[in-house]
UniProtKB/Swiss-Prot annotation:
SUPFAM superfamilies: Nucleic acid-binding proteins. This is Small ribosomal subunit protein uS12. The streptomycin sensitive allele is dominant to the resistant allele. It comes from Synechococcus elongatus (strain ATCC 33912 / PCC 7942 / FACHB-805) (Anacystis nidulans R2). GO terms for biological process: response to antibiotic; translation. The gene is rpsL. Pfam families: Ribosom_S12_S23.
């Protein structure tokens, strides 16, 4: 426990919170252009080919973003919207591409959790 004199001399240091998605620059989403669309493999216990894209953002950053859902229509020069949110088994992937906005099509034949995948309500 510091004395009052010690606190006057050296005040307590404020704890600075480090952001988990610096490329967004405190915005909820950011627009960007795909520079490369490819698949990558996850960390140790899991096995798959995860779809990811390298995206150059309007904030000047170039980040790796995950493409959620089954099937996608993205290619180089596609304009996409990204949000924060990491993929636990892909190191370095800290952003998600938002389906159903700009050049990204929604997931076809999606019936549950449609809003998360940009899918329209199916005809009854």
């Amino acid at each position: 426990m510091p004395t009052i004199q010690q606190l006057i001399r050296d005040e307590r240091e404020k704890i600075t919170k480090k952001t988990k998605s610096p490329a967004l620059k405190n915005c909820p989403q950011r627009r960007g252009v795909c520079t490369r669309v490819y698949t990558t493999t996850p960390k140790k216990p899991n096995s798959a080919l995860r779809k990811v894209a390298r995206v150059r953002l309007t904030s000047g950053f170039e980040v790796t973003a995950y493409i959620p859902g089954i099937g996608h229509n993205l290619q180089e020069h596609s304009v996409v919207m990204i949000r924060g949110g990491r993929v636990k088994d892909l190191p370095g992937v800290r952003y998600h591409i938002i389906r159903g906005t700009l050049d990204t099509a929604g997931v076809k034949d999606r019936r549950q959790s449609r809003s998360k995948y940009g899918a329209k309500r199916p005809k009854a």
